[in-house]
Structures are given as structure tokens and as C-alpha cells.
Regions:
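Short terminal hydrophobic/aromatic SLiMs and anchors at protein ends
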Residues: 1-2
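Catalytic machinery of carbohydrate-active enzymes
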Residues: 5, 44, 75-78, 106, ...
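Low-acidity, Ser/Thr- and Arg-rich intrinsically disordered low-complexity segments
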Residues: 6-15, 25-28
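Aromatic (phenylalanine/tyrosine) cluster motif
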Residues: 18-20
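Compositionally biased, intrinsically disordered low-complexity segments enriched in Pro/Arg/Gln/His
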Residues: 26-33, 672
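Membrane-anchoring hydrophobic helices of lipid-metabolizing enzymes
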Residues: 33-157, 192, 196, 202, ...
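Non-catalytic C-terminal accessory region of glycerolipid acyltransferases
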Residues: 73, 100-103, 147-148, 172, ...
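Catalytic core of membrane glycerolipid acyltransferases/transacylases, capturing the structured
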Residues: 151-209, 235-238, 386, 392
Length: 672
């Protein structure tokens, strides 16, 4: 459970319209890239020069037209905008409203970008004529600083309206000094072009990677410093709700204000007409004695309100709720996850993951610890298992599984994809089988992140892979190997399930004498019979024989004329009924079968007999009381993994009845 108002796991960009990375020394760049940088700079400089010849109203209209052209020719960004709008506004947002807001957003964005190139050429008087102030007393008191009492002010900015105006209004806050924290561009000439105009207005610029001490000094001296707060902050951010969905959020504004004793207020720029904007300033946000997480959450709440007031103005084409790569599970994020006290995990928008189940019972059972780890990976996670219908009852037994989608027998990949689509939106698909079919199912369903093993047969349909670990640890158990791969996605260690309470009443021992894989995994049937007789002479036992319909003759032969109490359920139980029966056993004596793995996951003590397979890799793993007993007679040719022994079956025949009887008796003595 998440503790409200607390971090629940261990763990800024500034204004600018050119989305490049951090500055790199020209000497470290290849000549071709240097040439491209130079050409981009010259092209941008020419564009800026041309735009500044135009009236600002023409820039605004031309920008709207260009924005609508981009809206028309880039459907991917339209989809991203609508996706973000659905997150923010939820089911109340109709498709028509989403389309209208998206179209208006592209028009506003184009207009504001072109105007941001024109604004540095305006005089102070011309710029003032284009601006008005909402909550002007807040602007005067906390940004201009009339009521700041010598304290600095951190202006929490966002990509809202014409956000570049924030870097052009230093003259409006005089005599206070003004600055902004920014992320330097990789292209040094472009970086200089962007910052030249800001500095011409008297705004000091601080590279967030190198010059934060300068920003802190300005604040301590009573200045005002702008910091962007609304971009995806990656591993540097705190994961907290924005419109109820977890997003990585920069704590820089809050920490800078608290560290320097500065005031903190939000400033946004709304578009209200033809080349006209309103600057909105919030009242100061309390910081003294509060956690950085709580202060940052307040900024998110204020941003939500601004977006609701002017939805077309926010930067919807930014992937604000970006899915991290490769660690989309958040147990190891640097700054942790934070939920305010008024929000519970049930209030969060779900992060939906679809896991394609293995097709075999044993493999599915060995995947259960990994499903527990995935579920613990983030508080908003909703875990759905896509399972063959025959295994659906198993997954419904697992508390960490929220939903099960059954694959009807003989369903085509396209039909399964349709089933997935009808179930709703999924953020991630994780494929446990290595089959091409499983990859086709989720690819056809349009799930954006599709993950499987590096050796997956449908790897070309995946966009993230997990590296197997068995080549580094050849003796790694299959369940541990899968857990090691799941950890590559950011999963924590799985929780240990609660201990099973042994059933009271008559002593019921299960017998599973078959193995669908083949006779090489079956201890001789007559020896099972001898063990049953030996134990029955010592204790009163109800023997229950379990197995598949194909093994019904084995059950009949084993039960025939048995002198004690025996129930033959071979081929007579559904998986649900088998689970119920297993829960009533004090012990299961079995070959290496899916039923063995099922008993293991249910916490039923097991005496397991291995022959052609390797117990180190696929034996029972759960901790039970009494502990599991694994019996095998090691010979030079096992494990061979053959379905039938081509020689003398020595690995099974040399495992004696006395050895197995002793193991059962010892296990029962620990579980009276």
C-alpha cells in the first residue's frame, strides 16, 4: 500500500523553442555535424531576420496558418495531443472536443512560436501594449517584489501560451534583477542565438547543469528567477500525479526556493486574442518547513487549473506522461514516487500492462513470482493476463492479477488482437512465450510498447527486449531467470506470499503418476503403488490420484484393488477443481509435472521425482513447511530432456521405493 503524503519508493528545463540537447564542444564534433550545425544556424538566423520585418499581427496569423499546416500533415502529433487531452480531461472529453482543442492548439502554437521570434525586436512600449495582467496585485507584490521584503522570487513557468515572453519582461520587474534557468542547446551557435535576445532585455541565463549557483545567488540577493516545471523530467524527477496520472516532475523550482529562502509563485502566459496575451500570477506557495514533494505537488495542482482555464494553450504535443525506457516500472527511480494525502492508489489513472501467459501449466506457475514483482513495480499498475482458456483459473487465483483475458481455443492472432482492443487501452505488452504468434497478437492490437526476450521469434515486431541471464549463470532456475529479466524493467524483488496453513482433518496425500511430456519423466507406476502400500501400513491415509484425461488409465491401474482408501480423479477435474483438491492435500507425491509447479505455488509440500529433466532449472521453488523434497538418481546421461529413454531408463529405475517412502514419511513427520 502507498502511504499518503509520503515518498513510496527510493528515488528543468527552461524556456526555448529549439529542442536540442546539451552543449558540446565544437572540437568534439565530426566535420559533417559541424557543417549541419552551421547551416541550421544560418537558416534560423535568416528566418528570424525575415520574421522581424513583419508586423507582429502578421506573424501571429502566419503562425496560425503554419500551425494548421503542421496539424494537417503530422498525424502522429495529432494523436499525441489527443492522447494527452484524454489523460487530462478523462471520459468527459468527447472525440469532437478533443479534435477541436487539438486543432486550436496547433494554431496557437504556431502563432506563439513565430511571435516569440518577433517579440525581442519590439520596444518596451510595444511589448506592454500587447500584454495585460490577471491578478495584477500578485504580479506587483511577488514578481515586481513590492511585498517581497527583500526576498527573491522563483517564478514557476510552464510551456503555456507564448512562454518565451517570460524571458523578455526583465524591464517590467526593475529594479529587481531577473534571470531564467535553461537547458543549453547542443549547437553552440543556436544556443547563443536563443539567449542573445533574452540577455538583451537584461535577463541573466543560467545553464541548469553548470550555473545553478549563479541562480541561487541572484535569489539570495532578492532577484527573480524563472524555472520551467512542466516537462517530463526523466530520472531526475519525482513521480507524482498530474491529472491523476503519474508523471516525472522536476522538483527544481521548489528546491531552489526552499534552499535560498525565496518566495515561489506560478506564472503563466495565456493567449487571449490577435497577438495579445495575459500574464497570470498565483499567490505565493508556502515553502517553509514543507517537503519538496508537497511543494512540487502544489505546482502541479496550479498547472492543472491553468490548463482547465485555457486548454488550447498548453503544450500538448510534448509527451508529458512519457513511458520510461527501459525501466517503465518505478521501484528504482532516483527521487521516488509521491502521492499527496488526499490521493490514494485507487484514485490514480491506471498504468495498464498486458502479460501474455505461457501456454503450459508448469511454465505459467514459474512465472507467478515475476507477476508479483511486476505488480509491486508501481502503485498505479493494473495487471491483465492474456491466457489460454485452460490456464485462466490459475491466474484468477493470484491476488496480484487484476484481470484475465481468455484466449478461446483455435483463435487466430487477429481474433485475439480484437479481444485485446475490446478490453481497453494497454500501455505495455510483455510476452512470456517466444512464439511469433504472441508477438503478432499484441502488434495487431496496437499496443505501443511490446517487450519480449532477445531470442524471441517475433523480435522484429517488438520494440524492447530483455536479455536472458542463463548464459551468465547456466544453473539459474527458470523462475529466477525470468525474475532477472523482469528486473531489467525496473521491478523490485517479489513479495513472499503468506505461509500456507496445513489443512486439518483426515490425512490426504496427492499422487500425480503421469507427465504429459512423455514416459521419460514418469517413475514406474508399480513403484508408486508400493509407496502407497508402505505408507498405508504406517498411517491412515486417503490417497488422491490426479492427472489429465490422457492419464486416466494410469489412475485406474494405480487405484485398482488398492487395499486402502483411494480416490481416482485422473481426467475428472477442471483446473479450478484441481486447485481446490491440491489445497486440501498435506503432501503431493509427483513426477516433474505442471501439477507439481501448481502445488508449489499453492504452498503444498511436494516430494518430486526427477529423471530426464533438471531440478535445478525447473524444480519446485516455493518455501513450504515442511520443505519440498526433490528426489533423483544422478547418472551420466541425465538430464537428457528426451521424451522417451532410448536405453535402460536407469535414472528412474535406480531410484528405489525405500528412498521415496522415507522421503514421504519424513515430510509427513514434519507436518503431523
Amino acid at each position: 500500500m502507498v502511504a499518503p503524503g509520503r515518498k513510496i519508493s527510493k528515488t528543468s528545463r527552461a524556456s526555448g523553442i529549439f529542442p536540442f540537447g546539451t552543449t558540446t564542444s565544437p572540437l568534439s564534433l565530426p566535420p559533417s555535424l559541424l557543417l549541419m550545425d552551421r547551416l541550421l544556424y544560418l537558416l534560423s538566423l535568416s528566418l528570424v531576420t525575415l520574421i522581424r520585418l513583419l508586423p507582429i499581427t502578421v506573424c501571429f496569423v502566419l503562425g496560425q496558418i503554419l500551425g494548421l499546416i503542421v496539424w494537417a500533415i503530422l498525424p502522429g502529433y495529432r494523436r499525441l495531443s489527443k492522447q494527452n487531452l484524454r489523460i487530462a480531461f478523462g471520459p468527459d472529453l468527447t472525440p469532437g472536443n478533443a479534435a477541436t482543442i487539438t486543432r486550436q492548439h496547433f494554431a496557437n502554437l504556431g502563432a506563439n512560436i513565430l511571435c516569440s521570434l518577433k517579440i525581442p525586436a519590439l520596444s518596451e512600449k510595444q511589448l506592454r501594449s500587447r500584454l495585460s495582467f490577471d491578478q495584477e496585485e500578485n504580479w506587483e507584490d511577488w514578481i515586481v517584489g513590492k511585498e517581497a521584503n527583500g526576498q527573491g522570487t522563483v517564478a514557476a513557468l510552464s510551456h503555456f501560451g507564448n512562454w518565451e515572453i517570460n524571458a523578455q519582461i526583465a524591464e517590467f520587474v526593475k529594479p529587481r534583477r531577473a534571470g531564467c534557468v535553461y537547458q543549453a542547446l547542443r549547437n553552440a551557435k543556436m544556443d547563443d542565438l536563443v539567449n542573445r535576445d533574452r540577455r538583451s532585455r537584461g535577463v541573466a541565463t543560467f545553464d541548469r547543469k553548470k550555473e545553478m549557483q549563479g541562480a541561487a545567488t541572484m535569489l539570495k540577493e532578492g532577484g527573480v528567477v524563472g524555472v520551467l516545471t512542466d516537462q517530463h523530467a526523466g530520472n531526475a524527477g519525482i513521480w507524482m500525479p498530474l491529472f491523476g496520472k503519474l508523471a516525472s516532475t522536476s522538483p527544481l523550482a521548489a528546491s531552489l526556493a526552499q534552499r535560498t529562502g525565496a518566495l515561489l509563485a506560478q506564472v503563466t502566459v495565456r493567449t487571449v486574442g490577435l497577438a495579445r496575451w495575459v500574464i497570470h500570477t498565483s499567490a505565493p506557495i508556502p515553502t517553509e518547513g514543507r517537503e519538496i514533494t508537497a511543494i512540487t505537488m502544489d505546482l502541479n495542482h496550479l498547472l492543472e487549473q491553468e490548463i482547465l482555464n485555457s486548454p488550447a494553450d498548453w503544450f500538448w504535443v510534448h509527451n508529458r506522461w512519457k513511458l520510461p525506457y527501459p525501466n517503465f516500472l518505478l521501484s528504482e527511480v532516483k527521487r521516488g514516487i509521491y502521492l499527496p494525502s488526499e490521493i490514494t492508489t485507487a484514485d490514480l489513472q491506471s498504468f495498464n500492462i498486458l502479460v501474455r501467459s505461457p501456454n503450459w501449466l508448469g511454465d505459467a506457475c514459474m512465472a507467478i513470482p515475476s507477476m508479483r514483482a511486476i505488480k509491486a513495480g508501481r502503485p498505479d499498475l493494473r495487471l491483465t493476463i492474456l491466457s489460454p482458456a485452460k490456464l485462466a483459473p490459475l491466474w484468477r487465483e493470484i491476488p496480484e492479477v487484476d484481470a484475465v483475458l481468455e484466449i478461446p481455443p483455435r483463435s487466430s492472432p487477429r481474433k485475439v488482437a480484437s479481444l485485446i482492443k475490446k478490453a481497453g487501452h494497454f500501455d505495455v505488452a510483455l510476452l512470456l512465450p517466444n512464439s511469433l504468434r504472441s508477438a503478432l497478437e499484441v502488434w495487431l492490437a496496437g499496443i505501443p510498447r511490446r517487450i519480449g526476450r532477445e531470442i524471441h521469434r517475433g523480435r522484429w515486431l517488438l520494440n524492447q527486449t530483455m536479455a536472458p541471464r542463463r548464459e551468465l549463470h547456466p544453473a539459474l532456475h527458470q523462475a529466477e531467470e525470468l525474475l532477472a529479466m523482469i528486473r531489467q524493467l525496473g521491478a523490485p524483488e517479489p513479495a513472499i506470499p503468506p505461509s500456507r496453513v496445513s489443512p486439518s482433518g483426515s490425512l490426504r496425500i496427492g499422487i500425480c503418476p503421469g507427465a504429459e511430456y512423455g514416459p521419460a519423466k514418469r517413475w514406474p507406476l508399480e513403484r508408486y503403488r508400493e509407496v502407497m502400500e508402505n505408507i498405508s501400513r504406517q498411517r491412515e491415509v486417503i490417497w488422491v490420484i490426479v492427472g489429465t484425461a490422457k492419464e486416466s488409465t494410469l489412475g485406474e491401474e494405480l487405484a485398482k484393488d488398492f487395499p486402502g482408501s483411494v480416490e481416482n480423479l485422473c481426467g475428472k477435474t477442471t483446473l479450478t477443481e484441481l486447485i481446490t483438491e491440491l489445497k486440501g492435500f498435506q503432501l503431493l507425491l509427483t513426477n516433474d509435472t505442471g501439477t507439481m509447479h501448481l502445488a508449489d505455488q499453492l504452498g503444498v509440500p511436494v516430494v518430486a521425482i526427477f529423471g530426464s529433466t533438471e531440478s535445478i532449472l525447473t524444480g519446485p521453488t516455493n518455501t513450504t513447511t515442511p520443505p519440498h523434497r526433490i528426489l533423483r538418481h544422478k547418472v551420466e546421461c541425465n538430464p537428457c530432456y528426451l521424451r522417451e529413454c532410448p536405453i535402460d531408463f536407469r535414472c528412474m529405475k535406480e531410484l528405489t521405493v525405500d528412498t521415496v517412502t522415507t522421503a514421504v514419511v519424513e515430510s509427513l513427520s514434519l507436518n503431523p
